[in-house]
Amino acid sequence: MVLAMSGSAAGPPPTAMARFVGVPLAPLATAPGEPPFATLYVSATVAVTATEAGSSHVATRLWMHGDPAELGPLYTAPVPHGVEVGRLDAMPEGHAIPAGISNGWTPVELDGYVPANAVVDSLDRVWKLAELNYETTCNDCHMPHEPNEYSPMQWGMIMPRMARFAKLLPNEEMSILKWLQNTSATSDTRR
């Protein structure tokens, strides 16, 4: 099942080891070679259940706001605590649409295939590169802000404007944004 009701928080199924999307954008398809129905962003937590023909079969639990039939952003948890880690772009034919739950947030389970090289065991290297890119690029115009100076939602509003000024490539922007949001989300200091 590609999209199903889930009763627990974001992340991989409890019996699987957590891995992460380690590339800025990973297309998620129902089968290798099929068109994607969703895109997972760097830092999305997944469980790899199999690898075949250059693709990894993954499962993850995420959250959507509103009616999943309308498609849209996928989050690690309901906002303001969650970080956007993907987008549901199409409803695979014949799959269940879960009913909404508290405050309009719906937990969903996604199951599909991503390129095998999109999955990493640790985000350490990805985050170090994003942090270095953030510090060197932003330092050209101003003193870089500490990630915990803004909430994940605020970084989502600030970063697109800054990326235009810095002429960042979309993949660079996505990696830096997710590093800022995840670092901000794990800090105790909030503005």
Predicted regions, residues:
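SH3-family beta-barrel domains
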Residues: 4-35, 39-41, 49-54, 73-123
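Basic/aromatic-rich interaction segments and small domains that mediate binding to polyanionic partners
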Residues: 59-69
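Mixed-charge (acidic/basic) macromolecular-recognition segments
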Residues: 122-127, 146
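The canonical Cys-X-X-Cys-His
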Residues: 134-144, 176
